[in-house]
């Protein structure tokens, strides 16, 4: 019955918003400079462009997506404007990386998660502070905040100097199943977006946080291209399902296994 209801709603929305599809943009605005102290940017020693985001979860650990793994990763913390860096901005490199599966063998619906230990810890400052892991999973219809330095237009790419933030909603997993096809009956992911489109994470936002009611609930994983299409919400790694694994690794149990 749930699937039938979701499909019916999708059909109604598709008819309602078909004429608006050409007007879609990657919605959102510049983040408030004080709202993303936990947001980090990833780049490599070969390129200064931020290619992924990540989330500081304590002074020594950053969480991002497995598909953001690269050689020679650099981690920028305390950033807002790329052109005018904050005085307390810091750069770190990973000392260790931990995966549920290899960064080459994760799937779109499972285990797209990477935990990085910084070579040197960071201190809290005006623009740097960790966010806590979630105590409970988010509920459907929760209002969430997605953020990053990814492109703000699609399919043409326009990369901003400052991170952009947008409010999106947690949706039934069945909505993503209907939208993307090929997804299993269950997965450790969250389906999030705006059904009418216009607001979405996009290229360059991968690995960044999804914050719901003040809690770090998701890691930007993948979605449709062009971004921001109606009826094509994004898919996010569900952080709550991995909290035990994360906490075990941080505690020193490097042989900890992820949930099946």
From Swiss-Prot:
Q: GO biological process annotations for this chain's record?
A: proteolysis
The record's GO CC annotations read: extracellular region; secretory granule
* Primary location recorded for the protein, binned into one broad class: secreted
**What residues make up the propeptide removed on maturation?**
19-24
Question: How does changing the pH alter activity?
Answer: Optimum pH is 7.5-8.0.
The chain's disulfide connectivity reads: 31-165, 52-68, 100-258, 144-212, 176-191, 202-227
In its miscellaneous comment, the UniProt entry states:
Negative results: has no activity on gamma chain.
Biological function? Thrombin-like snake venom serine protease. The recombinant form clots fibrinogen by cleaving fibrinogen Aalpha chain (FGA), and slowly Bbeta chain (FGB). Has amidolytic activities.
Q: What is the name of this protein?
A: Thrombin-like enzyme gloshedobin
Supply the source organism for this entry: Gloydius shedaoensis (Shedao island pit viper)
